[in-house]
Regions:
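Short, contiguous strand/loop micro-motifs
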Residues: 16-18, 53-55, 117-118
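Active-site-adjacent "subsite" loops/lids of carbohydrate-active enzymes
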Residues: 85-130
Length: 130
């Protein structure tokens, strides 16, 4: 901790800027508010899979690089999350077996967070690829 944050406790939040990429002014206001609240760390990427991989095998990390750079400039540390909290639409359409199965034997519908089958080999492989 001494080398990373000068011995200070982490004071932060989950941050999901991928929701506002078309509105850079929202990020700038968020950054201003984070600084005003003395935020020194954020978790990024928890629900960003559909933006990081909009199509199977097609990746876009440019926005994430840009956000990380701006946070770094503002002396805000970044904790990268595994972006499996929300699956992209293409994944559930192509591989419906990644969806959780309820007690009545029916699969959950897509659109919820943390809604994947933890034992699905396909899901595990797709998370590793990402």
């Amino acid at each position: 901790m001494e080398t990373m944050l000068g011995g200070h406790l982490l004071h932060g939040c989950d941050y999901n800027p991928e929701q506002w990429l078309e509105y850079p002014e929202v990020f700038e206001e968020d950054l201003r508010l984070m600084k005003a609240a003395e935020i020194n760390s954020v978790t990024l990427g928890v629900f960003s899979w559909s933006v990081l991989e909009p199509e199977e095998g097609v990746y876009d990390f440019e926005w994430l690089d840009r956000i990380i750079g701006r946070l770094w400039e503002a002396d805000i540390q970044v904790i990268l999350a595994t972006p499996s909290g929300a699956m992209p639409h293409w994944l559930t359409q192509k591989y419906p077996e990644v969806m959780q199965v309820r007690a009545d034997g029916r699969r959950n519908l897509p659109g919820k967070r943390h809604n994947f089958c933890y034992t699905s080999p396909i899901m595990r492989e797709k998370i590793k690829e990402l």
